[in-house]
């Protein structure tokens, strides 16, 4: 891969969902600790934070790149039951009760469990006013479109591509290419923004899109093309992409 600088008008911006548009409030580990306490277990939020991080790392290591981790919409519950079992197994080897599973599932599918970052609405309004196409590309459950609708974000997006519905996910190129086709744009005319170096930054670039990493907490200083806030992409609307902001287009 040889980086080249090409000024191409950005006609569309794709956004990741979690840690880009939305964040859980209260934090995930606090919710798990509270629900597990209903089964008689006593874990701190720190305990859960470590167990969740270790479980996600193991799941990602086992996944085939781009494979839908849920096995389609019908496999979502099975995936999360197995995930919860692994989390609890790391903590004390205990069993997650059906009631605990249902409480967690209901919580995270509710609008009230999620908040929209303060920089989201201003940038969406700005880009929409500039006639820039907008889409969501996310590795998420099938309820994401309803969640976006509940927060009033759906009207901004021409399409929402969700891995559980698409049957493919990031970093695989297919989900990016499908979204490009739905908006009628070529990959080089798209900027993708998300928080995952692998799924968002590398995945989008591998599909021929431009990409920036949204690094809200300054965790990835090794990635040159990163931003700390969505407001930093406002300058791309309606004109050629700034190479210093958006980075190089991948080529072989």
Positions of PLM-derived features:
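N-terminal helical cap/lid subdomain that shapes the substrate entry/recognition surface
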Residues: 5-118, 130
């Amino acid at each position: 891969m040889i980086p080249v600088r090409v000024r191409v008008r950005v006609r569309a911006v794709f956004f990741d969902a979690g840690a880009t548009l939305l964040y859980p409030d209260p934090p995930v580990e606090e919710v798990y600790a509270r629900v597990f306490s209903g089964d008689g277990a006593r874990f701190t939020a720190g305990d859960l934070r470590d167990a969740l991080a270790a479980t996600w790392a193991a799941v990602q290591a086992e996944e085939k790149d781009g494979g839908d981790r849920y096995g389609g919409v019908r496999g979502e519950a099975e995936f999360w039951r197995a995930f919860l079992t692994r989390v609890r197994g790391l903590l004390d080897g205990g069993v997650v009760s059906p009631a605990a599973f249902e409480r967690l599932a209901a919580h995270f599918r509710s609008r009230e469990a999620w908040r929209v970052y303060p920089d989201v609405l201003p940038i969406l309004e700005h880009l929409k006013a500039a006639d820039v196409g907008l889409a969501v590309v996310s590795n998420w459950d099938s309820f994401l479109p309803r969640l976006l609708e509940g927060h009033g974000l759906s009207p901004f997006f021409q399409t929402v591509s969700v891995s559980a519905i698409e049957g493919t996910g990031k970093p695989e190129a297919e989900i990016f290419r499908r979204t490009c086709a739905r908006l009628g744009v070529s990959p080089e005319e798209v900027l993708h923004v998300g928080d995952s170096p692998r799924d968002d930054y590398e995945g989008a670039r591998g599909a021929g899109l431009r990409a920036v990493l949204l690094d809200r907490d300054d965790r990835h200083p090794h990635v040159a093309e990163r931003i700390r806030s969505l407001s930093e992409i406002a300058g791309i609307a309606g004109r050629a992409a700034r190479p210093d902001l958006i980075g190089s287009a991948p080529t072989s």
